[in-house]
Swiss-Prot record:
GO terms for molecular function: calcium ion binding; enzyme regulator activity. One of its GO terms (cellular component) is cytoplasm. Residues 9-44, 80-115, 116-148 form the EF-hand domain. Ca(2+) 1 binds at D22, D24, D26, R28, E33. This is Probable calcium-binding protein CML7. Coiled coil: none annotated. Gene3D superfamilies: EF-hand. Keywords: Calcium, Metal-binding, Repeat. Pfam families: EF-hand_6, EF-hand_7. Ca(2+) 2 binds at D93, D95, S97, T99, D104. PANTHER family: CALMODULIN LIKE 3, MYOSIN LIGHT CHAIN 1, 3. Potential calcium sensor. The lineage of its organism: Eukaryota, Viridiplantae, Streptophyta, Embryophyta, Tracheophyta.
Amino acid sequence: MGGKELSEEQVASMREAFSLFDTDGDGRIAPSELGVLMRSLGGNPTQAQLRDIAAQEKLTAPFDFPRFLDLMRAHLRPEPFDRPLRDAFRVLDKDASGTVSVADLRHVLTSIGEKLEPHEFDEWIREVDVAPDGTIRYDDFIRRIVAK
């Protein structure tokens, strides 16, 4: 079956999740549990996607862990790891314009949570285009940060 290789860590997480959902301990899980199981592992399949997977994979009976790994290799689409970053920017983007004020961003990143030093922020901000009104497009900022 095509798809991506899974790391030992991913397989261990999947084994743990699988065993939690295998409530009767028979080593098998009902097809109806697949969506919850995938979501517990960072996937975010829609009901339509789950129906497609079930049809494509002919999932009509409970399946075991090796079959589950095959399904995950083929179908697990993890949430983009930059989503929390995008969500944080959206909070600062009060008018939903796709831009944030450099001053607001500086304040948040140098004073909340794992604080950046002001000189670290200055290094980051030098890598993006700041508009004349003092804002940046956060998609550009995220793209540059994620690329590093």
